[in-house]
């Protein structure tokens, strides 16, 4: 069995990943590593061994690597993998991993939105937080997981008129058809976050 260290995995991943909007050959890569014994039998929260993403590029280049942690987000990631995945080797995710109970999936959604309470919690990452809330709203309502642009379009049809321009702007910026200026829309963003969180909390209760 080949054993690879976090530095080896993350530095190798950097070579085939590029920051969002870079326009290069590679797309932004996200990688999550779990040990099957830590997620089967399923428990909440489960342990994540390693995670790679472009938001960690600076830390990785400086030699800082996240340790293994208990991560509520694995309930969402494994649900997504079981719904939409392609196995490159071995059995499918739907047979390799156990289903995540609905109550744990809902708790993971609730625990995720709990981190966004004040402007400082999303400052500099406004677009991603707005789109993440759209995905969570969609998932809380349907039990399914959709791409950010699909979830944003779905949510825009259910928003009061005053919040639609922001979600449409975030979606367009994500798709690359418009510039991302959400950092300049401080009050709009805060109002959307408050409204989306309150709506999601009502659905999950």
Residue ranges and their predicted role:
Residues 105-169:
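Extended, basic/helix-rich recognition subdomains
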Residues 1-15:
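An N-terminal structural lobe/cap that precedes and organizes the functional/catalytic core
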């Amino acid at each position: 069995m080949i054993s690879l260290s976090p530095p080896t995995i993350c530095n190798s991943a950097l070579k085939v990943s590029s920051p969002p909007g870079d326009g290069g050959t590679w797309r932004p890569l996200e990688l999550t590593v779990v040990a099957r014994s830590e997620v089967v039998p399923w428990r909440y929260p489960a342990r994540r061994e390693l995670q790679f993403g472009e938001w960690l590029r600076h830390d990785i280049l400086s030699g800082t690597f996240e340790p293994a942690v208990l991560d509520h987000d694995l309930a969402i990631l494994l649900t997504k993998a079981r719904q939409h995945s392609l196995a490159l080797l071995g059995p499918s995710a739907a047979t390799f991993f156990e289903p995540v109970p609905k109550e744990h999936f809902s708790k993971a959604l609730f625990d995720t939105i709990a981190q966004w309470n004040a402007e400082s919690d999303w400052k500099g990452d406004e677009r991603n937080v707005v789109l993440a809330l759209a995905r969570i709203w969609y998932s809380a309502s349907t039990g399914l997981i959709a791409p950010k642009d699909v979830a944003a379009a779905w949510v825009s049809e259910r928003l009061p008129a005053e919040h639609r321009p922001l979600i449409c702007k975030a979606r367009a910026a994500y798709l690359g058809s418009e510039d991302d200026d959400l950092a300049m829309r401080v009050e709009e963003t805060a109002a959307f976050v408050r409204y989306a969180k309150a709506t999601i909390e009502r659905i999950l209760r």
